[in-house]
From Swiss-Prot:
Induction: Induced upon differentiation of CD4-positive T cells toward Th17 effector cells upon antigen receptor binding in the presence of IL6 and TGFB1. Up-regulated by IL23A-IL12B, IL1B and TNF and inhibited by IFNG and IL4. Up-regulated by pro-inflammatory cytokines in response to microbes in various immune cells: induced in innate lymphoid cells upon fungal infection, in Vdelta4-positive gamma-delta T cells upon C.mastitidis infection, in Vdelta5-positive gamma-delta T cells upon S.aureus infection and in Vdelta1-positive gamma-delta T cells upon E.coli infection. The keyword Repeat does not apply. This is Interleukin-17A. The gene is Il17a. Glycans are attached at N71. Effector cytokine of innate and adaptive immune system involved in antimicrobial host defense and maintenance of tissue integrity. Signals via IL17RA-IL17RC heterodimeric receptor complex, triggering homotypic interaction of IL17RA and IL17RC chains with TRAF3IP2 adapter. This leads to downstream TRAF6-mediated activation of NF-kappa-B and MAPkinase pathways ultimately resulting in transcriptional activation of cytokines, chemokines, antimicrobial peptides and matrix metalloproteinases, with potential strong immune inflammation.
Amino acid sequence: MSPGRASSVSLMLLLLLSLAATVKAAAIIPQSSACPNTEAKDFLQNVKVNLKVFNSLGAKVSSRRPSDYLNRSTSPWTLHRNEDPDRYPSVIWEAQCRHQRCVNAEGKLDHHMNSVLIQQEILVLKREPESCPFTFRVEKMLVGVGCTCVASIVRQAA
């Protein structure tokens, strides 16, 4: 048997094995009475969801990676992994400001400026309820996407 043929046979066996494991795993998951009946004729078997986000700015967008900014900013941040297997997307990277203050050109903290988290609301798909493996709901989620500098609020004693 040729190497190409052997690898395609191996791939086919691997796919069959994973399908068998999936079917076996699906049979074990207990179904709540609140779950929709997936065997019913009127149950929608396939749903196509377009999750692509189109860039309305086209070629005007900089090709510079966002990771360049998190270190060069006067309000630097770190990215933290937020993982939830019952959510799509299951992994979301969230920003957290490194300091309460901003960093000046010399790399020292500027006590006249505050570092503030920039947040963006996104939509995610959440599995609902946990006992219904094929049911999802749309949920809003507030995600930190970066940090910026703002002037400190100075209150004068009267």
